[in-house]
Every structure is written in structure tokens, then in C-alpha cells.
Amino acid sequence: MKTLSYLLLVFAILPCIALAQLLNQSEPLPGVTSSGQPDAAELAGLAEKGFVAVIDLRGESEDRGFNESSVVEELGMQYVSIPMSGSEAVNYDNAATLDSILKTAGGPVLVHCASGNRAGALLSLRQMLIGEDADSALATGIAGGLTSPALREVVESKLSER
């Protein structure tokens, strides 16, 4: 009986542990978690928590260590790739794509890159696109993982264009 109780406890907390271990994890918006690269176990934890989609901002040439799209789809979540390599990819077209996905997802979504910086950057532009002022949009991006001074400059420049 003791062993059964222990196993039940372990399986009950595994999804929570997986979610808590995401690299640079934050929840900058309700229903939107941003982070660095998750592994397969962390993705399984997200599926257990009811996440419906994973938005991968990493470029095609970036090594993930596993076939992320296959794992996400096998777990019953939608996989979306918005490849963002280089500062020119921090743009309002990609922000509009992100906005469309977030509006139609129907549940919690993970937005990730390698470290969380691109996730925060794109979330900033998305917030500006939907009508937030530049300061609020930037604050959302910072809350979403935007920590790189160089990328922040790019975001601030893009925000000032609107």
C-alpha cells in the first residue's frame, strides 16, 4: 500500500515538476507560457497540464536534440514553427502569425526559442500589434524572457515604428 501511494504521488506531481523546470519559464500573458527549449519530458508535462499548442521560434538549423514536432503531435498538441533566425525575423509579420495562433488556440500555449529572448521579443511586437502602448508591450516582452540588451534594442526600434 505504501508503494502504491508513493507511485500515485510521483505520477501526480510529475507534470508540475516538468512545467516548473522549463528554462527561463514565465507566464507573460494569461494562457501563454514562454520559455527556452523544452525537452520531451517537459513537453509531456505540458500536455498533462492541458496545453494545446507549442510555438517554436527556433530556426530550422538549430539543434533541438530530438524531433520536437513529432513529439508534440504524438502528445496531442499542435506544433507551429515560426522560424526566427536573426534580428530581421523580429517583425510584425511574425507577430501577426503569433497573434493568429494565440487567438485560435483554445487553451494554454507554450511559445519558446532557445533561451526565451526571441519569445519575449515577438510577444512585445504582438502586444503592440493588438493595441498596447509601447511601454506595456515592452514590459510584456521582458516578462516573457526578453533579457538580451541587443535584442531589446531591436524590439524598442520596432515598437517606435508604430
PLM region descriptions:
Residues 1-2:
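N-terminal hydrophobic targeting signals that begin at the initiator methionine
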Residues 5-17:
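Bacterial N-terminal signal peptides
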Residues 16-109, 124-162:
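Cys-dependent protein tyrosine phosphatase-like superfamily
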Residues 110-120:
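A phosphate-binding catalytic loop at a beta-strand-loop-alpha-helix junction
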